Amino acid sequence: MDGIFISYRRDDSAGYAGRLYDRLAAHFGAERVFMDVEGIEPGLDFVDAIEEAVSSCRVLIAVIGDEWTNAADAAGRRRLDDPNDFIRLETGAALKRGIRVVPVLVGGAVMPLAADLPEELKALTRRQAIEINHKQWEASTGELIRTLESILKTPPVATAAGNQPSADPGVAKVSAVSGSMAGNAAATHGNSRRWALPA
């Protein structure tokens, strides 16, 4: 249970998230770094699937760009106000389970205010953030890597729900999320590992 889960919005920080994946995978190994929960076998509960995927990791990186808080859907509704928003589900699952959440600010973004977040995400505003940028990529991501190294070498704690996280590496949990999903529904992002969820 030593995986790193990268949570991000495609229309907000996809460029940063993809580059960050490559940097972390090169340092920690591709089998320990995951990004995207975007598809799941028909008939499975996607909320449960996201919680299982997140719980297989030791730390969740919340990549926050300047549209992370106010991004809207096609109808103009703020995505964070949707209980089924993937970012809300991913981050909320990590906070609920006591998984370490590291906010990573990109593109000049600032931390959201608690008043602007749904109840289950308000604790995110109390997490110390790291800022990364393309101009100082090696230095800023180096700080993040040192933080992750410190987290991953620390023994895991019991989750808020009283359940002990799985000891298996995150890569083994792809199949736990959706049975045979790893074999027939995985998507790719460069060399990234992704859980595929139906659109």
Which residues are covered by each model-predicted region?
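Cytosolic linker/terminal segments flanking nucleotidyl-cyclase catalytic modules
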Residues: 2, 12, 18, 91-95, ...
